[in-house]
Swiss-Prot record:
Gene: ESR1
Protein name: Estrogen receptor
Span list, region Interaction with DDX5: 35-174
Binding site for 17beta-estradiol: 353, 394, 524
SMART domains tied to this protein: HOLI, ZnF_C4
Basic and acidic residues composition-biased segments: 154-165
Organism annotation: Sus scrofa (Pig)
Bias (Basic residues): 257-269
Gene Ontology biological process terms from the UniProt entry: androgen metabolic process; antral ovarian follicle growth; cellular response to estradiol stimulus; cellular response to estrogen stimulus; epithelial cell development; epithelial cell proliferation involved in mammary gland duct elongation; estrogen receptor signaling pathway; fibroblast proliferation
Cited function: Nuclear hormone receptor. The steroid hormones and their receptors are involved in the regulation of eukaryotic gene expression and affect cellular proliferation and differentiation in target tissues. Ligand-dependent nuclear transactivation involves either direct homodimer binding to a palindromic estrogen response element (ERE) sequence or association with other DNA-binding transcription factors, such as AP-1/c-Jun, c-Fos, ATF-2, Sp1 and Sp3, to mediate ERE-independent signaling.
Cellular-component GO terms for this entry: chromatin; cytoplasm; euchromatin; Golgi apparatus; nucleus; plasma membrane; transcription regulator complex
Covalent lipid adducts (S-palmitoyl cysteine), residues: 447
Region of interest: Disordered: 144-174, 257-288, 551-575
Length: 595
């Protein structure tokens, strides 16, 4: 048998022919769709050179002749890439696979059929570093791009995002925890370093008060004893700074009555407060309830408040004990009264009475069961009515005169020195005469004053929310309790049932006159402020602005022209800053009654 000899080239061609015949049933014709318009910019024209720049600065020419390129599979079914049968397998062996003793630097990848995307655009804007060349010798793959093109797994990115979100939320919760502990100095409104001499104060005001009570404190104000004390101007006037220290409640003892007893008593009180919060606040509202200052947390539910179980005698005793102390004015009888001097005396006296009024309100039974916002709002609405009923009560024994303080007794003629004051004087004198005719008793007076406080803003700030409805119901229950106490006093005095009803109606009708006088007084005080007759104190000024915002004339109408947007933002929706600061830190029972 004769064996035909073949050269190496003819032998390889024969081998390729045999393999092509065996694989011919598997081949399918390539479907070619004619293009209706020219290729876009993202497609490659094989007739043009293609050079692509990578971020690392290396340029790759994909139309250059590739030496020893690895073939790849096409995407159309099981067929190999288009081209001649011999070229479909490349030049390196069967099916284009690398020999076992060689390692290809390029991976075997699956690519799109022609027309091919020039380099394939990833949705995230990254370019895939594999590219198919259309050469006469067959399809080949260029080497993969630099390792810098490696794209992280999407799951890893999501996990990293979740970790960043978790760390951000942890930082946010830590920031909120630290914000809840932020306290401000009651004197200058700087950051407080601790609880010193009975109030939260900074190191500077603490040291100043310590030096003042230990050494000489005969400070003299170079102005009118009305200097503003804040963070930037606290060192400008020592006299006014010391006066403000006393006004906010600083005392020589340095320990409040409810803080005596040492560390064990402090821990016991904290445990009691925690138990009270758990009873009063639902679990879902615990986080929001902790934002309020601890002395004002509600410790009892409204329906189970111990105030509602008080007897009439216990209610009277509590109201009498809550009465504020007597305050003296700065009146100098040797100096004649003028418009500026009289308004200065009255505003100074009112400003100091406001601080004592805050302490009195907190001792009214049932008042502390309300939220902080509602307590401050009631005070903002009723403060001038409360001052006026106290003035009328003190003036009952002085017909034709008004007793503003034990050392300040004014008649109608003296009120003429202030423009517009005579009308208010006449109304106050008429109400005092009415009290005198009715022979108003001290127990009835304290009940009427408490009714003014609780009834002043109950219909102006409560919304239809469940919490507001609960507050409204609680206020009405306390008002009913005080009304029952009034009836008990009348019955105890020996009045018949008909006389009790008549006297109760007469007393309650007088309260409407106090509301009318209060509105007149607010208008007059506001006019004096606009005329710059007298500089108002910070607390009195904020109370005046808050009352104007709560007044019915401003509901739905434009705000006062002289108020800035920041004042509207703070006063309209939240309690006044100065009043809230006095409310939380002020201890009026320790204030001096004279200056």
């Amino acid at each position: 048998m004769t064996m035909t000899l073949h050269t190496k080239a003819s032998g390889m061609a024969l081998l390729h022919q045999i393999q092509a015949n065996e694989l011919e049933p598997l081949n399918r014709p390539q479907l070619k769709i004619p293009l209706e318009r020219p290729l876009g910019e993202v497609y490659v024209d094989s007739s043009k050179p293609a050079v692509y720049n990578y971020p690392e600065g290396a340029a790759y020419d994909f139309n250059a002749a590739a030496a020893a390129s690895a073939p790849v599979y096409g995407q159309s079914g099981l067929a190999y890439g288009p081209g001649s049968e011999a070229a479909a397998f490349g030049a390196n062996g069967l099916g284009g696979f690398q020999p076992l003793n060689s390692v290809s630097p390029s991976p075997l990848v699956l690519l799109h059929p022609p027309p091919q995307l020039s380099p394939f655009l990833h949705p995230h804007g990254q370019q895939v570093p594999y590219y198919l060349e259309n050469e006469p010798s067959g399809y080949a793959v260029r080497e993969a791009g630099p390792p810098a093109f490696y794209r992280p797994n999407s799951d890893n990115r999501r996990q990293g995002g979740r970790e960043r979100l978790a760390s951000t939320s942890d930082k946010g919760s830590m920031a909120m925890e630290s914000a809840k502990e932020t306290r401000y100095c009651a004197v200058c409104n700087d950051y407080a370093s601790g609880y010193h001499y009975g109030v939260w104060s900074c190191e500077g005001c603490k040291a100043f008060f310590k030096r003042s009570i230990q050494g000489h404190n005969d400070y003299m104000c170079p102005a009118t004893n009305q200097c503003t004390i804040d963070k930037n101007r606290r060192k400008s006037c020592q006299a006014c700074r010391l006066r403000k220290c006393y006004e906010v409640g600083m005392m020589k003892g340095g320990i409040r009555k409810d803080r005596r007893g040492g560390r064990m008593l402090k821990h016991k009180r904290q445990r009691d407060d925690g138990e009270g919060r758990n009873e009063a606040v639902p679990p879902g509202d615990m986080r929001s309830a902790n934002l309020w200052p601890s002395p004002l947390l509600i410790k009892h539910t409204k329906k189970n408040s111990p105030v509602l179980s008080l007897t009439a005698d216990q209610m009277i005793s509590a109201l009498l004990e809550a009465e504020p102390p007597i305050i003296y004015s700065e009146y100098d009888p040797t100096r004649p009264l003028s418009e500026a001097s009289m308004m200065g005396l009255l505003t100074n006296l009112a400003d100091r009475e406001l601080v004592h009024m805050i302490n009195w309100a907190k001792r009214v039974p049932g008042f502390l069961d309300l939220s902080l916002h509602d307590q401050v709002h009631l005070l903002e609405c009723a403060w001038l009515e409360i001052l006026m009923i106290g003035l009328v009560w003190r003036s009952m024994e002085h017909p034709g005169k008004l007793l503003f303080a034990p050392n300040l007794l004014l008649d109608r003629n003296q009120g003429k020195c202030v423009e517009g004051m005579v009308e208010i004087f006449d109304m106050l004198l008429a109400t005092s005469s009415r009290f005198r005719m009715m022979n108003l008793q001290g127990e009835e007076f304290v009940c009427l004053k408490s009714i003014i406080l609780l009834n002043s803003g109950v219909y102006t700030f409560l919304s239809s929310t469940l919490k507001s409805l609960e507050e409204k119901d609680h206020i009405h229950r306390v008002l009913d309790k005080i009304t029952d106490t009034l009836i008990h006093l009348m019955a105890k005095a020996g009045l018949t049932l008909q006389q009790q009803h008549r006297r109760l109606a007469q007393l309650l009708l007088i309260l409407s006159h106090f509301r009318h006088m209060s509105n007149k007084g607010m208008e007059h005080l506001y006019n004096m402020k606009c005329k710059n007759v007298v500089p108002l104190y910070d607390l009195l000024l904020e109370m005046l602005d808050a009352h104007r915002l709560h007044a019915p004339t401003n509901l739905g109408g434009p705000p006062p022209e002289d108020m800035s947007q920041s004042q509207l933002a703070t006063s309209g929706s939240t309690p006044s800053h100065s009043l809230q600061m006095y409310y939380i830190t002020g201890e009026a029972e320790n204030f001096p009654t004279t200056i």
